[in-house]
A protein has these predicted regions:
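N-terminal Lys/Arg-rich, disordered targeting/topogenic segments
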Residues: 1-7
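Hydrophobic membrane-insertion alpha-helices, especially the h-region
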Residues: 9-25
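Catalytic glycan-binding domains that act on GlcNAc-containing polysaccharides
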Residues: 23-202
Length: 202
């Protein structure tokens, strides 16, 4: 009887430890996901891009870790390449800008939001610019132009199916799912209901 009682107690302790670990992990993940909301909101206001979209890209690119460096020298929260970062700096007339400045969350999200807005404008004549912009962000404009043929020229559903890189296709779908997940956390700022860049009707 004592042995069975001891086993039950051990099992209960193990369950409590596992539950405690799961709660700690959930709490830490939630805190991490909220850790960059300040810079994300500021960049969204500055460039009129939906903060939920910025956050979805940050989640996919760096999982909210600002010191990440990619294999192609992309850096920071939104994994910005030097060319895109310098393009933003030139547009904003920033003197003495260096790519390394994009390790700063505020700088990175500003540059990334500016670049996302540019890509969304680039595909404004499609039925939904977002998949095109995300594919461009991940694989570059030259590849998007290869895939943007026939019905996929303006039909975003056809375009996603026509993406030639499985990794890019999954990137687009993953970010769009995460974007939908984050949208309830960022209600529209304007009482008029005017949509921001990247935002679709709810």
């Amino acid at each position: 009887m004592r042995y069975k009682s001891l086993v039950k107690r051990c099992r209960l302790c193990l369950i409590l430890v596992l539950l405690g670990g799961a709660f700690a992990w959930w709490w830490w993940q939630g805190r991490l996901e909220r850790s960059q909301d300040g810079p994300i909101r500021a960049a969204a206001r500055r460039y009129g891009v939906d903060p939920a979209l910025i956050k979805a890209v940050v989640w996919r690119e760096s999982h909210f870790h600002p010191r990440v460096r990619g294999r192609a020298e992309e850096i920071g929260l939104m994994q910005l390449q030097e060319e895109a970062a310098r393009e933003w700096a030139a547009a904003e007339h920033l003197l003495g800008f260096e790519h390394e400045h994009c390790f700063d969350p505020g700088t990175n999200t500003l540059a990334g939001a500016w670049y996302l807005r540019k890509l969304l404008h680039r595909y404004a004549q499609t039925d939904n610019p977002l998949p095109y912009a995300l594919a461009d962000y991940n694989a570059g404009r030259s590849n998007v132009l290869k895939w943007k043929q026939g019905a996929a020229t303006t039909n975003s559903v056809a375009f996603v199916e026509q993406i030639g890189f499985p990794g890019t296709r999954e990137y687009v779908r993953t970010v769009m799912r995460r974007y939908a997940h984050y949208r309830p956390l960022f209600p529209p700022d304007s009482p008029t209901g005017q949509r921001r860049e990247g935002e679709r009707p709810r």
